[in-house]
Amino acid sequence: MTASIKPGDRVSMTVKYERDGAIGIFTFDNPPVNPLTPSMHKQFFHAMQEFLADDQIRCGILTGAGDRAFCAGDDIKTPYKKSLNRQEELADHLWPHRNEGETPENFTWARDLVMVERYKPIIGAVNGWCLGQGFIYLMHLTDIRIASPDAQFGAPEINYGMAGVGGNTRLGRFLPPPVAMWMLLTGEPLSAEDALKHSLINEIVDKEDLLTRARQIAAMIAVHPPEAVRIEMEVFYRSLDLSKTDALAFTKHMYRMQRLGLATHGGESIGDMKFAYSTK
């Protein structure tokens, strides 16, 4: 059983979560370069659950505090629990939060986060360095991405002999294979300009305007019916793993279910069998 986060603990959080109207904002806040500790992964997981459960929140933003880094990856200087033998290693793998208590001793909450089923959009606003686990979170947990001109994206795990930790499962979907393999095998970062050229990000925005632009994009999404946004996202992501025939069939079924189950919007009822698109 996981320990819940108490509202009074928010002030000491190094992963901040705040609501701004229909937008939820996640901020990595661990100066000076926002490295991730085991506790931060747990905080992020619980904040994500709060974000997903809140029907008043239509869209999210993920960013980092300060102007040096979005996130420098896992804090390798943080002491963490190591398995004593193979039996304990297997137990830790199958039951990662056993006997954990209030403070986690390893980075296993990261796995829970990247496996979250999420159909509520999040905008990634990358200021500066985006490395390692921070880069993995950006790929797994954001849908639209903007970055400052000095942003650098990297998967330096190979430099520490840490192959296959999660970045390679998504990077090939966002970048051409030679570019993805270059990053994974050399550990060299990708500049903001190259990230834009290869469509890893949508826009390059001046650093002082980054969060403002992220809010603008989130607001553009938040005005749409949440059921439509959810279905667009679910069909898009699930179809990536389906054949063309299955993807088209799935899309058709989701479309029909939306028409049958759409809640009232703009005065039009379910019985009218109409979408609540406003006319301009």
Model-derived segments and spans:
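Crotonase-fold acyl-CoA enzyme core
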Residues: 113-226
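A short, well-ordered alpha-helical element
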Residues: 14, 36-58, 82-84
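An acidic, glycine-rich surface segment that forms the CoA-thioester-binding/catalytic face
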Residues: 43-45, 49, 76-127, 168, ...
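Short, glycine-/small-residue-enriched flexible loop/hinge segments at domain edges that mediate gating
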Residues: 29, 56-67
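C-terminal alpha-helix plus adjacent terminal tail
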Residues: 1-21, 30, 67-69, 78, ...
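STAS-typified acidic loop motif
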Residues: 18-42
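Terminal peptide-recognition signature
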Residues: 26, 43-44, 62, 75, ...
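Structural motif
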Residues: 23-27, 61-63, 123-125, 146
